[in-house]
Amino acid sequence: MFFERHSGGERTILVHLEGQDPEAREDPQEFQELAISAGAETVAFFNVPRHRPTAKFLIGSGKVEELRDLVKVEHIDLVIFNHILTPSQERNLERVFECRVIDRTGLILDIFAQRARTHEGKLQVELAQLDHMSTRLVRGWTHLERQGGGIGMRGPGETQLETDRRLLRVRLRQIKGRLEKVRSQREQSRRGRSRADIPTVSLVGYTNAGKSTLFNNVTKSEVYAADQLFATLDPTLRRLELDDLGPIVLADTVGFIRHLPHKLVEAFRSTLEESSNSDLLLHVIDAAEPDRMLQIEQVMVVLGEIGAQDLPILEVYNKLDLLEGVEPQIQRDADGKPQRVWLSARDGSGLELLEQAIAELLGSDLFVGTLRLPQRFARLRAQFFELGAVQKEEYDDEGVSLLAVRLPRIELNRLVSREGLQPMEFIEQHTLQ
């Protein structure tokens, strides 16, 4: 990793700002789970009433003094705030406590740094970390000078802070360039799957909802799965044959969480695009979680950030083995389409219902027909050919292209909407023979 992060086992105080809304009241438990996931040794948990935040410390001076005394008595190494701190607040608190202080964003970034396993995942975490820490350079990043390209780069009369900032900008450009190549490779892979008419189904959901366990059971894979937050960061794709549909590609991606740092969403955009470019999303929900409605809302917020909120979604209520009196089942909407599936990824009950629901949704969402494309839509015509969706082409007496196509309806809608039009404006009533 490009810069040092705190190691596990540090003696830690957790500071939570109490709010009035239900979401804030439920947050302390998740905050403690995050700290455990990071490897912190929690010595004390502080609930601070959230009245009027102060510009200097965020919390009142009385609480700051109380925390300072506890830090000294308990020999605390780290204080973590379950709230976003400004760089100046972080520095002011560190001066008073004489120990390290990080906020919720820094904590989540640290967990991601520990969980990343692939080269791409590590680059994405590093990008988010550096972006977050760029506003905190006043701490004195003299260690940046030791990184690749540091020696010999300092200009005459340049301060250490200026050098650190310049080195940071260079490193950020390097990482973004590498991730752009990864993004391009992923796009090529997606185009290849689309040309082969293989739909992509992505697992999304709140962290620790059981996505990777479900993925492993369905695909007979051995992706890392554990009862911990953010066990999976790196996307995994597997080809799967469904009896009533044929081949699909199933993708397992990073889990979401409340107040997921925007920097992480941006850094992991190439990974999250596996979801936003899918034909169907499986929203995995922990059915045994009392707070699941808030978790569902947060997942929808992140899907909105990556442009995936309008994709077809099948809700998958997992962990049925932890509930009593609930059987595996498919629940349908008023039109009879599968809306949610209840199952247990751990013991495998209900998996056949999930496959049935996927086959129903994807099979009914294929468009097979003829499109009428005048010459001014040559670019749109080329895109259908690029996707491998064209089965036959003819021209009418006016030189208008008649394309017999077969592709997911959502893909048709996506391509046509880019032209500011509706699919019905192109659909020919008479199919080609």
Model segments located where?
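Switch I (effector-binding) loop of TRAFAC-class P-loop GTPase G-domains
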Residues: 3, 186, 193-199, 217-248, ...
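N-terminal accessory targeting/assembly segments
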Residues: 1-109, 424, 428-433
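Short alpha-helix plus adjacent loop in nuclease-associated cores
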Residues: 106-128
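Flexible beta-alpha connector loops of hexameric P-loop NTPases
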Residues: 18-23, 53-57, 115-120, 159-160, ...
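Conserved beta-strand segments of the P-loop GTPase G domain that flank and frequently precede/overlap
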Residues: 14-18, 45-48, 80-82, 283-286, ...
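C-terminal-of-GTPase-core extension/linker across diverse P-loop GTPases
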Residues: 1-14, 135-209, 215-216, 290, ...
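Conserved C-terminal guanine-recognition region of P-loop GTPase G domains, centered on the G4
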Residues: 26-36, 41, 64, 68-73, ...
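Conserved nucleotide-binding/hydrolysis micro-motifs of P-loop NTPases
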Residues: 18-22, 50-52, 84-87, 106-109, ...
